[in-house]
């Protein structure tokens, strides 16, 4: 068994995986429409702001949480953005699982045991 052959096999499987296909498809759809692209960027900014506040103060401000909620409502009305966000989460779970499996194969210290 050649390890590189197996890695290429995994790469080919990933290309055909529904999570990857959907993520790429919806990302392309969002990037093709400026308003959708801006919506995702705005959401990311507020999401980062909420995370920063949570790290600094223990919780995000009421104002930031309201912004997140409002952007979430707007996102749910844009099918491309909504599909993209869902596909991104599913891909993220898949990717995290793959990294955990590979980490365990090499050394248990690579895996975060939260």
Swiss-Prot record:
A Pfam family annotated for this UniProt entry: Com_YlbF
Coiled coil: none
Leader peptide range in chain numbering: none
SUPFAM superfamilies: YheA/YmcA-like
Transmembrane regions listed in the UniProt entry: none
InterPro entries documented for this protein: Com_YlbF, YheA/YmcA-like_dom_sf
Family to which this protein belongs: Belongs to the UPF0342 family.
Protein name: UPF0342 protein NT01CX_2274
């Amino acid at each position: 068994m050649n390890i590189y052959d197996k890695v290429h096999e995994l790469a080919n499987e990933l290309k055909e995986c529904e999570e990857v296909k959907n993520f790429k498809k919806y990302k392309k759809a969002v990037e093709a429409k400026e308003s959708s692209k801006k919506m995702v960027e705005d959401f990311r900014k507020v999401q980062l702001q909420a995370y920063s506040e949570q790290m600094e103060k223990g919780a995000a401000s009421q104002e930031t949480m309201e912004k997140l909620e409002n952007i979430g409502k707007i996102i749910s009305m844009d099918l491309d953005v909504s599909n993209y966000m869902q596909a991104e989460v599913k891909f993220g779970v898949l990717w995290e699982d793959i990294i955990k499996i590979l980490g365990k194969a090499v050394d248990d210290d690579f895996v975060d045991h939260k």
